[in-house]
Amino acid sequence: MINIAVIGVGRWGVHLLRNFLALPQVNVVAVVDPLPERLAVIKQQFNLDEKVVLTTQWQDLKGLSELTAVAIATPATTHYALVKDALNWGCHVLAEKPLTLYPTECQELCDLARQQQLILMVDHTYLFHPAVEGGKAVLQAGKLGDLRYGYAARTHLGPVRQDVDALWDLAIHDIAIFNNWLGQVPISVQATGRVWLQQQTTKEIHTSASGLADLVWVTLTYPDGFQAYIHLCWLNPDKQRRLAVVGSLGTLVFDEMSPSSPLTLLHGEFQRQEHLFLPINQSQETLELQTGEPLQRVCSTFITSILQNTQPQISSGEVGTQLVKILSALTTSLNQNGKLIPLNNS
């Protein structure tokens, strides 16, 4: 039995708690949240046993000798201290993304987990989405032919963050999916953006002199020359959650706004006739997907990794660290008007 504590039961943490309570191999022994009234609501909502420790101080967990693992769903600025302490207590850790806001901190935590022989996993939920898993299988089967480029759009009208810009708020999902589908990480990145709403800010984390970017355009270049282009914006009423990879034989589209058919394979290619390029073999195929809540799969993968003493391959601490490195490089590019920033992936 895995004894786990959930730190942070806000908008996302409450779903982590729900999923861990449903797993037969898990015993939730503690819940931490800075708001006492929130803990009271959670206790009633889930009818928590009187033995479950409810506390506003995460340091109280140190005294729980039976604690095996910790799930952290708090603001990213708190992750480094929380994860480090949990690992030093001898606990396996599942952390909400991003792992931290700085690559050096991420790498330090990965090294600590390795030294302590503990599991460090990051909750990149999209990597457990059936459509993402199905899309990876399509690419591995070579059904798109020669890959040409990728594109994604993640736009909506709010919420507008006051601690990080649209890049840090939105980009990590699509970058994670492209990396997963391609089996590669970028060798260079570029980003440009615009600020309208918060042109001056007192925050010091991942902001530029012009403020928090509301619109960001991202370019990722991979080792084989493949490029992916991402449109990010939180002031666009046209809500989009769309990602695609274009190949010589067709295009694979993951559209989260189409719940009945989120993964589609659009077939088509060109036939040359003299000076013309004529489209041929055009068709559309909606791909069958497995069912299941992605977050439930995140939680069960974390528990299985602990029980089997094996690091999760899909969303390990190292995967989370690589994504933070990419976001940091994109921030550098954004602050230097789109300068090409090489990545050291060693």
Locations of the language-model features?
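N-terminal Rossmann-like dinucleotide-binding module
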Residues: 1-48
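Conserved SAM-binding strand-loop segment of SAM-dependent methyltransferases
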Residues: 51-57
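Beta-strand-loop-alpha-helix segment that lines the small-molecule cofactor/substrate pocket
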Residues: 64, 69, 75-127
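C-terminal helix-rich "cap/oligomerization" subdomain common to oxidoreductases
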Residues: 69-71, 118, 301-346
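Glycine-centered short loops/turns at secondary-structure junctions
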Residues: 90, 117, 225, 337-338
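A contiguous active-site-proximal alpha/beta segment in oxidoreductase catalytic domains
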Residues: 100-162
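C-terminal glycine/acidic-rich active-site capping loop/insertion
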Residues: 125, 206-208, 247-318, 339-342
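Rossmann-like dinucleotide-binding domain that binds NAD(P)(H)
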Residues: 158-227, 232-238, 244, 318
